[in-house]
Amino acid sequence: EEDLKKGLKEVGLAEGRVFNKSLLDRVEQELRQQYFGRGYYAVSIQPTVTPLERNRVDININIEEGASAKIKQINIVGAKEFSEKDLLSQFELTTPGWITWYTKNDQYSRQKLSADLEKLKSFYMNRGFLEFAVDSTQVSISPDKRDVYITINLNEGARYQVSSVKLAGDFTISEEELAKLVVVKPGDVFSREKLNESNK
């Protein structure tokens, strides 16, 4: 509640300020989006404005969060080289299981989904798929706003191998010694992780 009051004050809704109805409407929409982003699709936000004496108003924002929506299904479309099970094992988000009552990883969050998509990209980039891309993600909610269905459409692209490794620059130690430190070798499947190790 204190964080909410602080946020309202920052946007101009605070005691002593001139009341602006359009600003209150914008705050309501932003609050709704914040709750949606955390998986609370059943949230109810009811602002009420009560006129007081001496041209003042009393603003009350009643929020009922409701239950957070649970992930019912995650589908990955376009994967050919890896199984959906292997790809979903990279994700923090998951469907309800015996431990999710504790981890809450079955509760949809826009931020968590973005982080999981980054993990998916790293998974592919470390296995030679330089052109990997997530073409689209669809998040749909059941009519009762309790279940979330996620569909991820991806394009794996081609798998690349390292054809050659060349060292360039002025070296204080021999090129042979430096070559021993290079993790990436010709013929290896390209890996962004290995390339970063070699750069250290």
Listing of model-derived features with the role each one plays in the protein:
Residues 1-200:
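Interaction-mediating elements
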